[in-house]
UniProtKB/Swiss-Prot annotation:
It is found in: Nucleus. It comes from Arabidopsis thaliana. Its EC number is 3.6.4.-. DNA helicase that acts as an essential component of the spindle assembly checkpoint. Probable chromatin remodeling factor that regulate homologous recombination (HR) and non-homologous recombination (NHR). InterPro entries: Helicase_ATP-bd, Helicase_C-like, P-loop_NTPase, SNF2-like_sf, SNF2/RAD54-like_C, SNF2_N, SNF2_RAD54_helicase_repair. Belongs to the SNF2/RAD54 helicase family. It is an enzyme of class 3 (hydrolase). Residues 1043-1069 form a coiled coil. Residues 736-895 form the Helicase C-terminal domain. The keyword rRNA-binding does not apply. The keyword Coiled coil applies. Keywords: ATP-binding, Coiled coil, DNA recombination, DNA-binding, Helicase, Hydrolase, Nucleotide-binding, Nucleus. GO terms for molecular function: ATP binding; DNA binding; helicase activity; hydrolase activity. This is Protein CHROMATIN REMODELING 24.
Length: 1090
């Protein structure tokens, strides 16, 4: 009767409990049944356990008495609906239960504990259980099959919520990403990306087939729960059927060991560590009897799990918390930049932890560049990574201004690869000229970022929108062009696509990179304004020529990359540009030179940490690696105009139409002069019409009318038939090119020929064809695929030894190291244009010595253009290099460009001046000296060595102590007056990589306010004008003058013009100078590409 009462009081056991009892009987010797009263007294209820922040609940059984063999909590139902949150009854908490930790100290044995737990990893191999020979009968199997039927019917009714994630082929049966040996930072299919299905769920919870909190261990080393999601109910049943069928056939359990009374099973739970990449996270468990489990999981393990709280705050709809990643538990809570879970992006660190990797740290951040990329970099590129990392830790941008051909694109691509590898950024925007985008794609593929890159420059609007949405919703690199940015600024701001709440600063783009960033040198253009409207945490400009015409361009670039560094535009003009321009002029006084040098030094020191520039001569000279790059010799060949060219040139300058054009449109007149110097056939009637058609978009109606009259004036004086029959002889440049090729081609040299206009290339092409030379050509009409194909053909070296290119197209981004001779046919107002052309051949990968020929007609407008190039080059070096520069030339007055040479066209004053300056530095090897002598036989006016420019340091004039002290006091006064006008950020890190002068003091602030001494002269002029005007109004006085007041009227006219010129000069900060270079270079690039 008592037994029946006890049976009535005992609750029915669940299916798993019954199954556990059967397996217990199969694997252990029979025991004496314990007294029923023991189990009756310890009867407990099931408890519902809620994981903090998760919707699913886990039903747990408390420990029962030893009669039933339950010594640990068993998870029975993972998918049951929520019924309420209750506390866990911790009866029997004193029993020992091993953790899944690898520590052997936790693997202890206590008498009376069960042989194993029913909590089983169904992705692990089937267990091999000990058995007794007497338990192999058919009766036992029939009972087991009955249990299986019950389990199948039970599981068929269970509600299993399954996320329908699209899984990659890289996942095995357990939902664990396989080891990836291939090194590639891909997007939705690679180890470097966040899987597309994961991006739709919580960002830090991996919802694969097999996921769960691996273990929870209390402070005394006691174990808690092990939670697992299974694939489907069918797979669940099939796994158990296979496991039970193996009962009696296996003697050991591979992959997991359970605590047992035997000495062979004391290893603790082991979760098949060879496959699974889910990290074990230890958490403490309170020992009080009634514990709120949701509060426990949220608070325990504070030393590790709490540090990842920021990564999981938005995971309110997921089932279980999975802390994955090799270093996830080691992450620090203080993170100035974003850091992501290691497994969140499907990224396997072990496949990338190789030798030669670069690791940089700073401000609790860690940057790692895998060795497979790091080993591809030159030493100077590794230094560039250090500089870029210093900017990153400061939250700043900068200008990478390395000399052309030093691999700036590779430096940036490698740095981005390390940032993505280190989980420090999610998105980067790269803006470049369209001709450079294939080169970017190639370099990004080299560092393994090809699958992460999306193109945003095609003609299909829908395709562009799709790629933009893909990047903004996930991660990766977006490639686009300046024109696309200008027309799609709002879309790139990301307001319509962007939903990431992880960004504390609200910036959609972590990095914005501008290749050929000097294209935004004019801050008033829509191009520059649209780029400034796109939010970005870091802005990097890549430009080998950050200063092309004037210092205002430098301010514009830093205003984009480091806003506020140089103040506003007016402040920069008053405190820097004004004094530097005065000091760099050849006619500057000693005092102006010294003040200009002081201000220039301050400017260099101020921008130094944010501006990195290395020259090829420095990079491959200082580190003993000169063998890696060959030698370059640049020579200027001064040519004499042919008789026909000289006649046209003189007639044009002396004509009345030119004088009228001077007052109306000097740009159009300069265009005609340049074309006369290149080739008279450019100015035939048909060519004049072509020029007008191409210039319609850049010239006003008035300017177009002037240009038409000028061009037709020249065309009417040209005998077209005579020109056609004497194509080579009427142009000194074309005649020289053909004579030079007769010497170069037989010797096996390969030649690049650059011109600014397609029309000039056509004339050169006609001469090459008539002389039987094979050649290749690309210009603005060549399509991008054909352009790349042509470049590859030339680099292979089997098609043609001559390559014709326009400066605007061929001067950007191309690598033509197969050539060792470069001819620049016509100079550009912008010196960087010619320099870009030269560096197509002289760059990393060149193994031959390179000779560059810059063709200039002596005593013409081209010579004055070259002088202007040298002047601008000195200005650039003054602002960026720590050396006192030689002052070769002064600012030119506009009238000098239209004046006839005093010494005739056969002598070049510039060539003579440069020879006097550098004659003692000219040291030519035997081969080059012989070649120069050959050039002199071709009837040239002379040769200048362009490579020697700025090779000397300007002498510093000695001054008296009294004068020096006075200048020092005045400078200190100026510093004090301007120091409060702008706030400067403290400079940290990166300075050693930008410049390395010994006399740099980063803490020094030199801010100079202008002293406008023109106010006095302007007031004097106005006073004289007033006095002369009053005198002229006195009719009695004027009547007594011999000339009737004509001289007074002339003086008034001169003073009025002088005052007008002074005010115009003040607006451009170039006193008494009219400078049209900036306007000319802009319009010529658009209008003269014929």
């Amino acid at each position: 009767m008592a037994e029946n009462t006890a049976s009535h009081r005992r609750k029915p056991r669940s299916l798993n409990d019954r199954h556990y009892s059967i397996l217990q009987d199969l694997s252990a010797p029979p025991r004496q049944p314990p007294s029923s009263s023991h189990g009756e007294d310890e009867e407990t209820k099931k408890s519902m356990i809620k994981l903090a922040g998760r919707r699913r609940l886990c039903k747990a059984l408390p420990k029962e008495d030893e009669a039933d063999g339950y010594d640990d909590p068993d998870l029975v139902d993972f998918y049951s609906p929520v019924k309420g949150e209750t506390s866990l009854d911790s009866a029997g908490i004193g029993n020992k239960f091993t953790s899944w930790d690898e520590s052997k100290e936790a693997n202890t044995e206590l008498a009376g504990e069960p042989n194993f737990s029913i909590i089983t990893d169904f992705c692990s191999p089937s267990p091999q259980l000990k058995q007794k020979e007497e338990m192999q009968g058919d009766g036992g199997r029939n009972e087991i099959m009955g249990i299986l039927d019950d389990l199948t019917s039970k599981l068929g009714t269970m509600s299993i919520q399954k996320k329908k994630d699209s899984q990659s082929n890289d996942f095995d049966a357990c939902g664990v990403k396989s080891q990836v040996d291939k090194f590639d930072f891909e997007d939705a299919k690679s180890s470097f990306s966040l899987l597309s299905d994961l991006s739709k769920s919580s960002p830090d919870v991996v919802t694969t087939y097999n996921a769960g909190v691996n273990s929870i261990k209390d402070k005394q080393g006691k174990s808690g729960f092990a939670i697992r999601e299974e694939q489907t109910s069918k797979e669940f049943s099939r796994e158990w059927e296979e496991r039970i069928s193996n009962v009696g056939k296996q003697n050991s359990y591979s992959g997991r060991h359970f605590d047992d009374n035997s000495e062979d099973n004391r290893q603790g739970y082991n979760l098949d560590r060879g496959k699974s990449q889910c990290k074990e996270v230890d958490q403490s468990m309170k020992t009080t009897r009634h514990i709120e489990v949701s509060e426990k999981i949220r608070t325990v393990g504070r030393s590790n799990a709490a540090k990842l709280r920021d990564l999981d705050e938005d995971d309110d709809d997921d089932d279980c918390l999975i802390l994955s990643g090799k270093k996830a538990a080691e992450m620090k809570i203080n993170k100035p930049a974003r850091s992501y879970n290691a497994k969140r992006h499907g990224y396997d660190e072990r496949s990338l932890e190789d030798e030669g990797s670069i690791t940089l740290t700073g401000l609790n951040l860690s940057y790692t560049l895998p060795g497979k990329i790091a080993t591809m970099l030159y030493p100077h590129q590794r230094e560039g990574l250090n500089w870029l990392w210093s900017l990153h830790t400061q939250g700043k941008g900068g200008i990478l201004g390395d000399d052309m051909g030093l691999g700036k694109t590779m430096q940036i691509c490698s740095f981005l690869a390390g940032l993505f590898h280190s989980k420090l950024i999610k998105r980067a925007l790269v803006v470049a000229p369209k001709t450079l985008l294939p080169h970017w794609m190639k370099e990004l593929a080299t560092v393994g970022l090809s699958q992460m890159t999306r193109e945003y420059y095609g003609t299909s609007t829908k395709a562009r929108e799709y790629d933009l949405h893909h990047i903004l919703q996930g991660k990766g690199i977006l490639l686009t062009t300046y024109d696309i940015v200008r027309n799609n600024t709002k879309a790139l701001q990301g307001d319509d696509h962007y939903t990431d709440e992880d960004d504390e600063d609200g910036n959609k783009w972590d990095y914005m990179i501008l290749d050929e960033g000097h294209l935004i040198k004019n801050p008033n253009t829509q191009r520059a304004k649209s780029l400034l409207e796109i939010p970005s945490s870091h802005r990097i400009i890549i430009s080998g020529t950050p200063i092309q015409n004037n210092l205002k361009e430098l301010w514009a670039l830093f205003n984009f990359s480091c806003p506020g560094l140089l103040g506003d535009k007016n402040w920069f003009k008053q405190n820097y540009e004004h004094y530097i321009l005065r000091g760099t002029d050849k006619n500057a006084t000693d005092r102006e030179q010294r003040i200009g040098s002081t201000v220039a030094k301050n400017l260099r020191e101020h921008i130094q940490p944010f501006f990195l520039r290395r020259l090829k001569s420095e990079v491959f000279g200082d580190d003993g690696a000169t063998s890696k790059l060959s030698k370059k010799d640049e020579i200027v060949v001064w040519l004499r105009l042919t008789a026909c060219q000289r006649q046209l040139y003189e007639a044009f300058l002396n004509s009345e139409i030119v004088l009228s054009a001077f007052d109306g449109s000097p740009l159009a007149a300069l265009t005609i002069l340049k074309k006369i110097c290149d080739h008279p056939l450019l100015l035939t009637k048909r060519a004049a019409e072509d020029v007008l058609e191409g210039m319609d978009s850049t010239l006003t109606q008035e300017e177009a009318g002037v240009a038409e009259r000028l061009a037709m004036h020249i065309a009417d004086n040209v005998d077209t038939d005579d020109f056609q029959t004497k194509n080579d002889s009427i142009s000194c440049k074309l005649s020289f090119i053909m004579s030079l090729l007769e010497n170069l081609i037989p010797e096996g040299h390969r030649v690049l020929i650059f011109s600014q206009t397609r029309k000039m290339l056509n004339l050169i092409q006609d001469s090459l064809t008539s002389n039987g030379y094979s050649f290749l050509r690309i210009d603005g009409t060549t399509k991008a695929p054909d352009r790349l194909k042509t470049v590859e053909e030339f680099q292979e070296g089997h098609v043609a030894p001559i390559f014709l290119l326009t400066s605007q197209v061929g001067g950007l981004g191309l690598t033509l190291t197969k050539a060792d001779r470069v001819i620049v046919v016509d100079p550009a107002w912008n010196p960087s244009t010619d320099n870009q052309s030269v560096d197509r051949a002289y760059r990393i990968g060149q193994t031959k010595d390179v000779i560059v020929y810059r063709l200039m007609t002596s005593a013409t407008v081209e010579e004055k253009i070259y002088r202007k190039q040298v002047y601008k080059g000195g200005l650039f070096k003054t602002a960026t290099e720590h050396k006192e520069q030689i002052r070769y030339f002064s600012q030119q007055d506009l009238r000098e460009l239209f004046s006839l040479p005093k010494g005739g066209f056969d002598v070049s004053p510039t060539q003579q001046q440069l020879y006097e300056e550098h004659y003692n530095q000219i040291k030519l090897d035997e081969k080059l000296e012989s070649h120069v002598k050959f050039l002199e036989t071709l009837g040239i006016a002379g040769v200048s060595h362009h490579s020697l420019l700025f090779s000397k340091t300007a002498p510093i004039q000695a001054i008296q102590k009294d004068e020096e002290e006075q200048i020092r006091r005045e400078t200190a006064l100026l510093l004090g007056r301007a120091s409060a006008s702008i706030s400067q950020d403290t400079v940290i890190n990166g300075a050693d990589y930008a410049f390395k002068p010994k006399d740099v003091n980063l803490d020094k602030r030199i801010n100079i306010s202008p002293v406008d001494d023109k106010e006095l002269s302007e007031s004097v002029i106005k006073a004289r004008l007033n006095r002369l005007t009053m005198l002229l109004q006195n009719k009695g006085t004027v009547s007594r003058l011999p000339d009737g007041g004509a001289k007074i009227q002339k003086q008034i006219a001169e003073l009025t013009r002088e005052l007008k010129d002074m005010k115009a000069a003040e607006r451009i900060n170039m006193p008494q100078v009219i400078d049209l270079e900036e306007d000319i270079s802009r319009k010529m690039q658009k209008g003269l590409n014929l």
